[in-house]
Each structure stands twice: as C-alpha cells, then as structure tokens.
C-alpha cells in the first residue's frame, strides 16, 4: 500500500507503523533525510548518505537502510565486474548518486570523482565527500561539471562512469552530460540510474564507443530485491520478476 505523507505528518506515520506492528516501509521524497531522525539504527552507508529509503521494524526497533546504493552496486557485480580498487566517475550529487557512491566506497572502490553542477546540491556534495573520506579508504573529490577539462581527464583514467542524475529521463531523453563521445573509451563500464527510457542517450553513446553498459533496470531490480529480503527474510523471486519487468529484453 502507498501512503502520501509529508514532513509534518511523518512522525505520526512512524508511530502508526509501530502501533500496527508493520514489518517495515519504503520511504520516498520528501522524507528520506527526515526519516534518519526517527529510526534507532542506520547502516554505515545510510550514515554516509544521510538519507534512507527503507525502514525495517523489529518489534519496535527501527533500522534504516538505503537500498539504492546496494541495488546499483549489485547490478554492477552481477555483470561480472569487480569494483574493488577501481575508479568511478559519478555524475550528480542527489540521493541516488550519493547512495551509489557510499555503497561503492564501502565495498572497495579506490576513488570516486564526483562531477555535478554548481547548484543547490554542490555544498551537500562537498560534505558527502568529506564524510566518505573520513570514514572509508576511498578517496572522493567533487568538481564542478562545468570544468570540462577536468571531466575529460577523469574519464581518461576511470574504470566506471555512472549517471546518477535525471538527465536522460523523459523529457530529457535526448540529452547527455557527455558532450564528446571521444571521451568514452572501450575499457570503460558505463552505468545508468535512469530506466525510462530503457536506452538513454548516454548508453547509446557508450555502446557506439565500445563500452560495456548497464541500464537503469539493474538498479531498479536489485534495490527492490534488497527491500524484499529485508522485510520478508526470504529469497527474492528473481526470475519471475525479471520476466514481469521484461528484464534483459
């Protein structure tokens, strides 16, 4: 069931969850950051991000998780790519992007080069980078996307390029943050958070450049799988859900 809950109503919603002995809930905007204040425990990744999208209720003890990051990193791993010791160029500094960065840092990325526009997220991105640098072995830098020379240099030495922004999603389906396809090299893994459209302009560019790609369905699938297991304690019906989603089609 879905409930529309604003910030003012959120504390009451949490009390209702406990009173009804609900096993848990998903959390969407605008409550992802606020929700951190109403759980008893946060995962290491959720602490780094400062936002959660999943709450699990164990007899009134609430744990907060962020499955966006685990979902995306799981999609990368399922493709056969080992992220340990690798460098990721990460586009954007919103919720999805920072969740991916946090989980990647925890699971062994050597370096994350954040690129985002100097907008309302920029200062938050700097703070996020500082938290990751202080709490993991991963080195995170944050650079204005307007610095195209720095962007080009980062891509030249990167192993992974991940788009954590809405660029590529309808109505921006004809746009990409990569202005020059020559910046993409065959050794680069290019991954998306956007799943509508299935094949974004960035993924089209990447395939033309000979890169391996992972579309946004991977993150959608695996973050949902993580939530399912957290709430039920059971294995996710992977093949059935893949069929329903048209995954891999």
Curated annotation (Swiss-Prot):
Binding site residues for substrate: 32, 68
UniProt catalytic activity: L-quinate + NAD(+) = 3-dehydroquinate + NADH + H(+); L-quinate + NADP(+) = 3-dehydroquinate + NADPH + H(+); shikimate + NADP(+) = 3-dehydroshikimate + NADPH + H(+); shikimate + NAD(+) = 3-dehydroshikimate + NADH + H(+)
Class of the enzyme per the UniProt entry, highest EC level: oxidoreductase
InterPro entries: Aminoacid_DH-like_N_sf, NAD(P)-bd_dom_sf, Quinate/Shikimate_DH, SDH_C, Shikimate_DH-bd_N, Shikimate_DH_fam
Record keywords: Amino-acid biosynthesis, Aromatic amino acid biosynthesis, NAD, NADP, Oxidoreductase
Signal sequence annotation: none
UniProt: NAD(+) binding residues: 93-96, 116-119, 166, 193-196, 216
Gene Ontology biological process terms in this record: amino acid biosynthetic process; aromatic amino acid family biosynthetic process; chorismate biosynthetic process; shikimate metabolic process
Annotated EC: 1.1.1.282
GO molecular function, one term: shikimate 3-dehydrogenase (NADP+) activity
The keyword NAD is assigned to this record: yes
Taxonomy, superkingdom: Bacteria
Pfam families: SDH_C, Shikimate_dh_N
Pathway the protein takes part in: Metabolic intermediate biosynthesis; chorismate biosynthesis; chorismate from D-erythrose 4-phosphate and phosphoenolpyruvate: step 4/7
SUPFAM superfamilies from the UniProt entry: Aminoacid dehydrogenase-like, N-terminal domain, NAD(P)-binding Rossmann-fold domains
Similarity comment: Belongs to the shikimate dehydrogenase family.
HAMAP family hit by this protein: Shikimate_DH_YdiB
Function: The actual biological function of YdiB remains unclear, nor is it known whether 3-dehydroshikimate or quinate represents the natural substrate. Catalyzes the reversible NAD-dependent reduction of both 3-dehydroshikimate (DHSA) and 3-dehydroquinate to yield shikimate (SA) and quinate, respectively. It can use both NAD or NADP for catalysis, however it has higher catalytic efficiency with NAD.
PANTHER family from the UniProt entry: BIFUNCTIONAL 3-DEHYDROQUINATE DEHYDRATASE_SHIKIMATE DEHYDROGENASE, CHLOROPLASTIC, SHIKIMATE DEHYDROGENASE
Subunit field text: Homodimer.
Protein's UniProt name: Quinate/shikimate dehydrogenase
Source organism per UniProt: Shigella flexneri serotype 5b (strain 8401)
Species classification: Bacteria, Pseudomonadati, Pseudomonadota, Gammaproteobacteria, Enterobacterales
């Amino acid at each position: 069931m879905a409930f529309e809950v604003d910030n003012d109503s959120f504390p009451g919603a949490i009390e209702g969850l406990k009173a009804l002995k609900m096993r848990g809930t998903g959390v969407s905007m605008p409550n992802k950051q606020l929700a951190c204040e109403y759980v008893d425990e946060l995962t290491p990744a959720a602490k780094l991000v400062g936002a959660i999208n999943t709450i699990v209720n164990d007899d009134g003890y609430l744990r907060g998780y962020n499955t966006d990051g685990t979902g995306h990193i799981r999609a990368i791993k399922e493709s056969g790519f080992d992220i340990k010791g690798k460098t990721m160029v990460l586009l954007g500094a919103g919720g999805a992007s920072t969740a991916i960065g946090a989980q990647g840092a925890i699971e062994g990325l050597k370096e994350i080069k954040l690129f985002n526009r100097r907008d309302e997220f920029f200062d938050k991105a700097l703070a996020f980078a500082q938290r990751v640098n202080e709490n993991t072995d991963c080195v995170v830098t944050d650079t204005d996307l307007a610095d195209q020379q720095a962007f080009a240099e980062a891509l030249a030495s990167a192993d992974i390029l991940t788009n954590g922004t809405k660029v590529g999603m309808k109505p921006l389906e004809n746009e990409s943050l990569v202005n020059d396809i020559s910046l993409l090299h065959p050794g680069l893994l290019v991954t998306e958070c956007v799943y509508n459209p299935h094949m974004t302009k960035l993924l089209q560019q990447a395939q033309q450049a000979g890169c391996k790609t992972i579309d946004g369905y991977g993150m959608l699938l695996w973050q949902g799988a993580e939530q399912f297991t957290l709430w039920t304690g059971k294995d996710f019906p992977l093949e059935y859900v893949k069929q329903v989603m048209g995954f891999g089609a």
